[in-house]
Amino acid sequence: MGAITGEGDFVYLGELAQDRALEAMLKKAEEIGLDKGVAFIVVQKKGQQVHRIAYTVLELERDPNLDKAGDIGRNYFGTVMLKLAQMLATYENSVPSDDRPLKAGEVDYEGGIVFEPDDDHIVLIGYSGGTEEEDVDISLIGKTKLLKPL
């Protein structure tokens, strides 16, 4: 199977499909008025360590808003990697959970989704840059695009 393009029903394994999905996520972010944010996609064989984290950056961070007391700004890359850390530890969507306390280096922000496109692989997709609901919607766009034939 080609690492760049994938083949047949397994197109999502290819870098081209993953890059196309990341582009669709950034396009959706821009369409809803976001000009900052970071998207990621991880596709891995079940039971194996992650071998590739694909990501793309619309804008890495937001400066502090001096009109809001206490606003220190936001590093979207840092936030999205914290979401990914939790997702890699649990293989569940990035959501608050009463079942598992957060560890240092994790956040309970929504915006990351996990799914199994076949019996052998698991996919993690996430975005940080909007509200939690916007981040989830953008991640779902990435999932749809990733699974679409080239």
Q: Across the structure, where does each feature detected by a protein language model lie?
A:
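Flexible, solvent-exposed loop/hinge segments and secondary-structure transition points
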Residues: M1-L150
